[in-house]
């Protein structure tokens, strides 16, 4: 199943990419489930991100690896794929696109996921949508200054 969210921010796309850091990753984490960052290498090919999700009564580890990164005059993107996923996910591929939009930038979360059962994909979609919609005001706040 696919999910796509776009947020326009008031900074250049190159500056936005430079600020895709561990600190931003932590700010983007929603209140639930609580996220403990175990490893964050960055956004370059072969970098890894490992988190522990705390669902109060149980915890799940999630590990993703950056499998692709490309840059052009109008866009920078990188792709993380889940290599160790929580039990409720069978497949995860998240393309982080930062696209030039005049003197601003569009941040696009382009996600492909599968749960163990097709029906669960439809049940999981709204949960995932709200988890990523949570990021929109954070992106806008973090990138509210004009580019330097």
Give residue spans per PLM region.
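Hydrophobic-ligand binding "helix-grip"
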Residues: 55-102
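Beta-strand/loop substructures that line and gate deep hydrophobic ligand-binding cavities in soluble
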Residues: 83-130
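Short, highly charged C-terminal tails/helix-capping segments
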Residues: 37-38, 141-148
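A non-catalytic, amphipathic alpha-helix used as a structural packing/dimerization or gating element
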Residues: 130-138
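Short, well-structured hydrophobic secondary-structure segments
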Residues: 40-60
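Intrinsic-disorder/low-complexity, polar/charged segments enriched in Ser/Thr/Lys/Arg/Asp/Glu/Gln
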Residues: 2-8, 48, 61, 75, ...
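Hydrophobic pocket/interface hotspot
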Residues: 15-20, 66, 78, 98, ...
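Hydrophobic ligand-binding cavity/cleft-lining segments
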Residues: 1-46
């Amino acid at each position: 199943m696919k999910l796509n969210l776009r947020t326009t921010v008031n900074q250049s796309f190159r500056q936005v990419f430079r600020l895709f850091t561990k600190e931003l990753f932590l700010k983007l984490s929603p209140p639930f489930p609580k996220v403990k960052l175990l490893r964050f290498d960055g956004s370059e090919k072969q970098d890894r991100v490992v988190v522990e999700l705390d669902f109060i009564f149980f915890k799940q580890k999630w590990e993703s690896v950056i499998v692709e990164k490309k840059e052009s005059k109008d866009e920078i993107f990188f792709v993380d794929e889940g290599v160790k996923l929580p039990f409720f996910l069978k497949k995860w591929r998240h393309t982080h696109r930062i696209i030039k939009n005049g003197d601003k930038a569009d941040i696009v979360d382009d996600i492909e996921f599968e749960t163990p059962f097709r029906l669960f994909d439809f049940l999981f979609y709204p949960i995932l949508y709200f988890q990523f919609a949570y990021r929109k005001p954070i992106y806008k706040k973090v990138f509210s200054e004009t580019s330097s």
